[in-house]
Design a protein with these regions (language model features):
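Acidic, glycine-rich catalytic/binding loops that coordinate metals and/or anionic ligands
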Residues: 2-14, 40-42, 93-102, 124-187, ...
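Zn2+-dependent peptidoglycan hydrolase active-site motif and core
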Residues: 31, 50-94, 113-127
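Short beta-strand segments
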Residues: 46, 81-84, 141-143
Length: 208
């Protein structure tokens, strides 16, 4: 196997693999997201972290008949990206609707919901871009969630690459710098918090 350093991921300092690709045929539908699973952790569900700043628009602590299991949706109002984190562990989401979230903040843990096309503990990651902040659901409304992350949209086999992400945020693009109050991470504080999860960061604001 070959380790690849991803530039953005819902796992931090944890090896993981792709177990379900975006756009692959499923029973009666096309997979609108990508499934990612921690590697080498057995039955220990690993923390899942937000891939962007944003506002929480939906929280389901258990499956509400959607097929997504426990899930949350975060809307980045600066670029209108909506990220759905599905198939999380029941009652593991430490968020409420309307809450502001920062990139790298924990949104839950991996789950293995009954009644889904599950491949063991994993997170289902789905992405849309909607100016109204409303997640529309379905493959036709989705965009490839691996774009710009360094993760290939290909299901893992034992001879394939696996990934690890160390928590270093992607610098904002020139277009993003024009936005209001875009944070940029300028100094890494090499200290882990007591949740065992992610690196802490000192922030400043871009000056237009």
């Amino acid at each position: 196997m070959v380790e690849v350093q991803a530039s953005l991921a819902p796992f931090i300092n944890q090896e993981f693999v792709v177990t379900g690709a975006w756009g692959e045929p499923r029973s009666g539908h096309i997979h609108a997201g990508i499934d990612l699973a921690s590697l080498g952790t057995g039955s220990n569900a690993q923390p899942i972290y937000s891939m962007s700043d944003g506002i929480v628009t939906r929280v389901d602590q258990t499956d509400q008949g959607t097929g997504y299991g426990a899930m949350c949706i975060i809307w980045n109002q600066n670029n209108n990206d909506l990220w759905l984190y599905g198939d999380l562990g029941d009652n593991s989401i430490p968020l409420t609707v309307g809450q502001t979230v920062q990139q790298g903040q924990q949104v839950g843990v991996e789950g293995n919901p009954a009644g889904t096309a599950s491949t063991g503990l994993h997170v289902h990651l789905e992405k849309e871009n909607q100016s109204d902040g409303i997640f529309k659901f379905g493959y036709n409304n989705s965009i490839d969630p691996t774009t710009g992350t360094g993760i290939l949209n290909e299901v893992y086999t034992s001879s394939d690459e696996y990934y690890i992400y160390d928590g270093t945020p992607i610098p904002p693009s020139a277009e993003e710098k024009k936005g209001f109050n875009w944070p940029v991470f300028t100094k890494v504080i090499r200290e882990r918090n007591n949740m065992g999860g992610f690196l802490l960061w000192k922030k400043r604001k871009w000056k237009n």
